[in-house]
Swiss-Prot record:
Major location (coarse): cytoplasm
Protein function: Specifically methylates the N4 position of cytidine in position 1402 (C1402) of 16S rRNA.
Protein source organism: Ralstonia pickettii (strain 12D)
Annotated Pfam families: Methyltransf_5
Protein name (record): Ribosomal RNA small subunit methyltransferase H
Entry's family note: Belongs to the methyltransferase superfamily. RsmH family.
Gene Ontology terms for molecular function: rRNA (cytosine-N4-)-methyltransferase activity
Amino acid sequence: MTTQTSTGLRHQTVLLDEAVDALIWRDDGIYIDGTFGRGGHSRRILERLGPGGRLVAFDKDPAAITEAGTVEDARFAIEHDSFAQMAQCLDARGIERVAGVLLDLGISSPQIDEGERGFSFRMDGPLDMRMDTTRGITAAQWLAEADERDIARVIRDYGEERFAVQIAKAIVARRGQSGDRGPLDRTSELAALVAQAVKTREKGQDPATRTFQALRIHVNQELADLETGLKAAFDRLEQGGRLVVISFHSLEDRIVKRFMQALARPEQSAAPELRRAPLRAHELPAPQLRLLGRVKPSEAEVSANPRARSAIMRVAERC
């Protein structure tokens, strides 16, 4: 589904049919779309729900909340918050159990294509990178104040960047200069600085890709939110309920895979002394999730939407 947003920008929802097919197993259930984005998944879910179904969506982005305001459906509700706050928000709505949770962890095309948001290294704009522009510090503010070791750690750990130390040194050195060469506050400045610091090139990838990813993850606490959100989602699932997660880079996918496998194969994640003990079948820890598989976009989808190429969808069902 290509969504024409209220701002006129277009967004192609990744794994649209595959995700909704995996999520909806009864049409009268309560479902969660943890990342409304520009509404592609939410609108398709509403098409599939019966009169008794409900959908609660979450998003930190004010632009997504504006877009959600165009959904005219009494079965739909939107929360201006992270899916990490799912438990509190559902409690406030009196919802104890849900039939399914969908988390699409990708950044939306309008966020990338709108230079003013600060996510893109290809378009000049303020070095912001906040999903929620109403709260928190910007990437520029953090880079202007953070310790060099912290900058290197974030770029290395969240961007898997080999040249993290060199990039961090260049950022801190830039802070000590005066005039127009002072602290970074534009995306184009950061992209140019990284290009000078990164000595080798990966085929088909801009040298700034990993650094921009790392800063976005850090500014928005994406991995911490993911771990909290996965636990909250599992805790709310009813028996037979589905957990569907679409990730776009290896850091996210490792967290999702580890979380699902720990609940599906608890005997493998048990303490070493328990794994070595001679236990009878009824003494083994019972699985709490059943893994339903992993799906990647088809060649046709990637051809139509190159941004889908790194997507991996994992599906599990509560036992």
